[in-house]
C-alpha cells in the first residue's frame, strides 16, 4: 500500500491536513492519547488504567507501530493544524470473532483508534482522519471498515452516525480490572456514498 497515492484527497486546507505518521510523532501521539482518555473517558475508564499510564512505554509502542507495522495493512496517520500534530488514527486488518464468518463483500479493516485532542475539536480533524483511513484501507482492498466504541460514548457514536456508520449487531465486554466495559461495534461499507465523513463534525 502506498499512502502517498491516496493522501491528496484527504489533505484538507493549507492550515489543516492529514499525513502518514513519522517516528518522531510517537511521543506526541502518546501524549494526545492519554490527554484525550483523561478528558473524554475519565469517567468510563478505571482509574488504574490512567494512573498506571507509562508515557515512555506508550511512545515506544507507537514508534514501533509506525516504523515496523505488523502487516502492510496496518498504519498510523496524524492530523495537523499547520505544523502541530493535533490528532491521530491507527488502523489494521480486522480480526473476526469466534462466531463470525468472513464478509462476502471482501476484507474488513478496523479503526483501532481515532482521537483528536479536545482543545482542537470541532475543526474537522476527525472527519479528515476518517476520510484518510477510509481511502487507505479501500486502496488496500478492504470493502468494510469497523470500529469498537464504548456503549456509553454517545459523542463518538454521534460522530460516526453523522458519517453514515451504524452498529452492526456485535458487542463485547472488556475486563479492565474494574467495572466491565461494554463496547458496541459500528461499521461502514467503503463503497457506500452515504458513509463519507461530513466536514467539520469533529
Regions found by a protein language model. Give the residues of each.
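Short phosphate-binding/catalytic loops that engage adenosine nucleotides
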Residues: 125, 142, 165
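Extreme N-terminal starter segment of soluble prokaryotic enzymes
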Residues: 15-17
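C-terminal "cap" of GNAT-fold acetyltransferases
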Residues: 105-109, 146, 150-202
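Hydrophobic pocket/interface hotspot
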Residues: 29, 33
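Acetyl-CoA-dependent GNAT
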Residues: 3-11, 20-23, 34-44, 50-121, ...
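Acidic/polar helix N-cap motif
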Residues: 22-25, 153
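Charged catalytic carboxylate motif
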Residues: 28, 128-129, 155
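Conserved GNAT acetyl-CoA-binding A-motif
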Residues: 137-149
Amino acid at each position: 500500500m502506498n499512502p502517498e497515492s491516496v493522501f491528496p484527497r484527504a489533505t484538507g486546507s493549507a492550515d489543516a491536513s492529514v499525513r502518514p505518521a513519522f517516528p518522531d510523532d510517537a511521543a506526541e501521539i502518546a501524549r494526545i492519547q492519554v490527554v484525550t482518555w483523561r478528558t473524554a473517558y475519565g469517567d468510563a475508564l478505571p482509574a488504574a488504567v490512567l494512573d498506571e499510564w507509562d508515557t515512555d512505554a506508550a511512545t515506544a509502542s507507537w514508534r514501533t507501530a509506525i516504523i515496523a507495522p505488523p502487516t502492510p495493512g496496518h498504519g498510523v496517520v496524524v492530523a495537523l493544524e499547520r505544523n502541530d500534530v493535533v490528532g491521530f488514527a491507527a488502523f489494521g486488518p480486522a480480526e473476526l470473532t469466534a462466531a463470525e464468518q468472513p464478509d462476502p463483500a471482501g476484507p474488513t479493516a478496523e479503526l483501532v483508534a481515532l482521537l483528536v485532542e479536545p482543545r482542537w475539536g470541532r475543526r474537522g480533524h476527525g472527519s479528515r482522519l476518517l476520510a484518510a483511513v477510509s481511502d487507505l484501507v479501500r486502496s488496500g482492498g478492504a470493502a468494510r471498515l469497523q470500529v469498537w466504541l464504548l456503549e456509553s460514548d454517545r459523542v463518538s457514536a454521534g460522530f460516526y452516525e453523522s458519517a453514515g456508520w451504524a452498529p452492526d449487531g456485535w458487542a463485547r465486554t472488556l475486563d479492565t480490572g474494574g467495572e466491565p466495559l461494554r463496547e458496541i461495534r459500528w461499521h461502514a461499507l467503503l463503497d457506500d456514498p452515504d458513509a463519507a465523513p461530513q466536514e467539520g463534525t469533529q
